[in-house]
Amino acid sequence: MNMHEKIKARAKELRSYTAENLPKMVKTKSYSSQEEDVARLIVTLLEEAGFDEVYIDGLGSVIGRVGNGPKKLAFDAHIDTVEVGNPDLWNFDPFSGEIKDGIVYGRGASD
């Protein structure tokens, strides 16, 4: 099995875990420069997922490591969100993490 297939297989294994935990992240407000709470949540989730090493660096980024082989795979993503704006324009609470028809709704759920 090549690396791409291994990654896809592992992602499939973690699909339910991801679906359970994405709403937790959506429920945690993480406006720009206020990401500490969601960073701590991500650390907990990565530890629960079995990462060998997880920490928050000096810039507030979550760093996680699995294994220690010669090959490296890096993921880079932002964990902040922008303000909600007018809450009356939302069809649901933007921090509810509501799941409807298999889709998680809320601020930051899709990017």
Show which residues each predicted segment covers.
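Acidic/His- and Gly-rich active-site-bordering loop/insert found
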Residues: 2-107
